[in-house]
UniProtKB/Swiss-Prot annotation:
A GO-annotated cellular component: mitochondrial matrix
A Gene Ontology BP annotation from the UniProt entry: citrulline biosynthetic process
Species name: Ovis aries (Sheep)
Reactions it catalyzes: carbamoyl phosphate + L-ornithine = L-citrulline + phosphate + H(+)
Gene: OTC
Identification of the protein by name: Ornithine transcarbamylase, mitochondrial
Amino acid sequence: MLFINLRTLLNNAALRNGHNFVVRNFRCGQPVQDKVQLKGRDLLTLKNFTGEEIKYMLWLSADLKFRIKQKGEYLPLLQGKSLGMIFEKRSTRTRLSTETGFALLGGHPCFLTTDDIHLGVNESLTDTARVLSSMTDAVLARVYKQSDLDILAKEASIPIVNGLSDLYHPIQILADYLTLQEHYGSLKGLTLSWIGDGNNILHSIMMSAAKFGMHLQVATPKGYEPDPSITKLAEQYAKENGTKLSLTNDPLEAACGGNVLITDTWISMGQEEEKKKRLQAFQGYQVTMKTAKVAAPDWTFLHCLPRKPEEVDDEVFYSPRSLVFPEAENRKWTIMAVMVSLLTDYSPQLQKPKF
């Protein structure tokens, strides 16, 4: 107890001697009042989280980024913990951000590909979940089918995190929102303009944007609209939160007045055989300065990467309005926050950002 109190006093004294720090009283291992409790939960889709719970993960992301990147602190919050990483699909940002982030916090990530493990093939999903539960503290799985994640979560006794599935990509959206909060200072009232495929990224935005008070304007080619059941739920969220949701097949209509222009790959992993058909269907959906002309004066651009020139031209992608590289970096801070929130009792020290 004496050591903890002394450490607290030294931490507070050091912070008071800083210049631009805004902090709350902080005591290691002691939750702040009214702290959101996420420990032990799964993160399969943002549909399962309230606006306050998502905001808490973003707050924790900002806190870790500030303490580690700006202040240079070492925070071994995951020391002694291990993470199983199951990847059925290739990855750059998801793998790098998770491996480096988990290790930076003192934990041990273990990467498994389809050469190492075959979900439901060489071993049942039930057996895999139980074995992983006995050897790791959490699992991040990047899979083809959301249903596989659901089974893993049902059978495992440890948190399961969706690293991407056919329906959702929640950890990408956390990085997007952190990036927008850093740029605009707040998320409430922003209009997001989605121009592209009705895919897992869009689904995750639809399950969360209204909870922040953000409006969403979606343009997809005919036949490539978002999942109808997800659209129905998104309409309910918009009604509950007093936000607007519109769907169209006209890219300029969706871009009109938008603060944030967002697109993604037109051809996701597993859709390579549809390439010719999709390229034809998405003609006219490239984000260009012509698209930006009808957007809000303060427009910015997001793309989760990797990017192809037919999706967005160089003029927009490499412009000062493009936030794609800060967005990519924030994948690391947000996945770190997810792991800390699901595996520890740590409370943010930084003042809560405005959302």
